[in-house]
């Protein structure tokens, strides 16, 4: 029995926390750095109208959206993103968790098609300290021009990987950000 259980352990997914069983989808939105909160609010109203379209999204039960900050910390493991006028966050409650993956894909396609100047990151709710589907890479060095060029090379290479989505840098419009 012990040997058999060791053999079966290879089939168990290797992750610290399982996927969340909450029927929720998280949508992170972003416009280019320097966009006013008023413009972000205007764009988000358009997103809300799209989400309210029951013919398009019949499985959306409700949603809450936030502009200028990453929303409240409604789950201990979810750390909101830093506040910025060009950022938004939406929590979507869906009626059927079995349709979550299809809903995420439909949201990605629809939102990106309808709002071409806006960036969307659409994910399922996660457990643990970070989203297990997300990979962060860091490019460091003393020369900002070289760092920027290398980061763009890396982005170009990542775009060639089948199934890779939401590839971006956090160097918004090459805007310097100083945190004190």
Predicted regions and their residues:
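Short, solvent-exposed amphipathic alpha-helical segments in soluble enzyme
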Residues: 109, 138, 153-156
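Solvent-exposed, membrane-proximal periplasmic/extracellular interface segments of envelope transport
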Residues: 1-2, 38-130
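Residues at or immediately flanking beta-strands
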Residues: 62-64, 119-121, 134-136, 166-168, ...
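Transmembrane helices with small-residue packing motifs
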Residues: 1-35, 119-124, 134, 161-165
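Beta-strand-rich non-transmembrane domains
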Residues: 148-180
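Structural beta->alpha junctions
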Residues: 19-24, 28-39, 80-84, 91-101, ...
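Short, well-ordered secondary-structure micro-motifs
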Residues: 76, 133, 179-180
